[in-house]
């Protein structure tokens, strides 16, 4: 039973009373601990226990966590690790750090959370690196086309000490943000209702000339333009209607984003192009991190490591068991129930896409941004170094089998 199902058994009036008295975060964390049938009494007791546990010591620091549109329900679809991080950090520090989880776009959204963190409105945030690249453009470094051959290679890079040198340190120095952990998927094209009655896409040329919504990533636009996928910026509020009405043919994003963001009813095919990162990450203000005592900094890093390990395993399971990103699709998954077909591309089609847009095949397309990112990173070759690290493991490694490492220890 999901947290939403558990809370759904409680009236909105009673739930409002609980959240008003104990706070949203305590209520969410408590609901996640309950099993079986949940009554108002059992939930109230769990919330009270959770609240007392969280506040048994006077917190030295309260971290305001702007979690964009995430909540207890959709974090069981796309396993971004936000609540696991918050729960573990509070327990690990025995209440010295308290995390105030603010989701449902209540304080910031996918495009604004990064700036709200930089301005000090929130202390940390969760959003995709691609949507955050507007306020922190160094995050574009993850988005070179076909730099990562698999989800396993993405996780391997994030665990590697090389990620500290190539990604985390330059990002922190330039934007004042500490990159903590991230989920990992690869983006494809999510086709709307205009492809509902068409055969499942098997060739890249079937997508040529389609008009597709693009996120905030500049490098993603380069790849889409090179593949004749016509990237167009469309406000999120207009994207679902655009896919439904056929005003746009598709949108570039990843599988679990389709599921958690309620896109599944208007998506007909999930075309698995795997052409660049889909990374729902959590970062915090470097200024806030640096202001904390050493043992609390250590705790934040250890909780980040725990969250990263959790995300690696949980999201891989959720892709199959919850989202339906598999062949065959399991009954009861979101894709199966909404008739979203998985369009897997053969190796020949992926190679064609690489020939059209990858850095190795079309280096001139990437020169300007590559030079810019290399300069921000102190003169290193960002693409070559990340691609090399990503290929340190066999290409057929399963994402759940990547060995976790504490990246900051070298």
Regions found by a protein language model. Give the residues of each.
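N-terminal secretory/targeting leader peptides
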Residues: 2-154, 179-410
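Short, solvent-exposed loop/beta-turn-alpha elements that line the ligand-binding surface or hinge
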Residues: 151-174, 205-206
């Amino acid at each position: 039973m999901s947290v939403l199902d558990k809370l759904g058994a409680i009236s909105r009036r009673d739930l409002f009373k609980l959240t008003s008295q104990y706070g949203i975060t305590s209520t969410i964390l408590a609901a996640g601990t309950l099993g079986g049938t949940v009554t108002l009494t059992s939930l109230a007791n769990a919330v009270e226990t959770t609240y007392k546990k969280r506040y048994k010591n006077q917190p030295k620091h309260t971290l305001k966590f702007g979690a964009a549109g995430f909540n207890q329900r959709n974090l069981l679809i796309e396993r971004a690790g936000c609540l696991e991080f918050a729960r573990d950090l509070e327990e690990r520090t025995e209440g010295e750090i308290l995390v105030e989880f603010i989701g449902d776009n209540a304080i910031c959204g996918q495009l604004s959370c990064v700036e709200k963190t930089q301005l000090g409105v929130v202390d940390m945030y969760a959003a995709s690196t691609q949507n955050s690249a507007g306020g922190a453009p160094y995050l574009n470094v993850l988005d070179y086309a076909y730099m990562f051959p698999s989800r396993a290679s993405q996780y391997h890079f994030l665990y590697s000490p090389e990620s500290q040198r190539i990604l985390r340190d330059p990002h922190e120095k330039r934007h004042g943000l500490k990159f903590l952990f991230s989920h990992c998927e690869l983006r494809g094209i999510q086709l709307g209702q205009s492809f509902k009655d068409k055969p499942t896409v098997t060739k890249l040329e079937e997508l040529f000339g389609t008009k597709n919504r693009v996120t905030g990533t500049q490098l993603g636009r380069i790849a889409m333009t090179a593949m004749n996928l016509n990237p167009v910026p469309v406000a999120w509020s207009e994207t679902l209607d655009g896919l439904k009405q056929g005003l746009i043919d598709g949108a570039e994003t990843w599988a679990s984003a389709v599921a958690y963001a309620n896109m599944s009813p208007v998506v007909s095919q999930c075309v698995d192009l795997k052409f660049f990162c889909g990374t729902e990450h959590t970062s915090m203000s470097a200024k806030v991190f640096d202001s904390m005592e050493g043992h609390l900094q250590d705790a934040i890093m250890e909780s980040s490591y725990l969250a990263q390990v959790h995300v690696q395993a949980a999201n891989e399971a959720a892709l199959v068991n919850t989202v339906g990103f598999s062949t065959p699709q399991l009954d009861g998954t979101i894709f199966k129930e909404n008739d979203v077909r998985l369009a897997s591309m053969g190796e020949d089609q992926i190679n064609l896409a690489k020939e059209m847009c990858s850095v190795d095949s079309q280096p001139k397309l990437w020169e300007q941004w590559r030079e810019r990112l290399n300069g921000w990173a102190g003169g290193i070759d960002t693409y070559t170094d990340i691609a090399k690290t990503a290929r340190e493991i066999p290409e057929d490694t399963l994402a759940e089998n990547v060995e976790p490492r504490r990246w900051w220890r070298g």
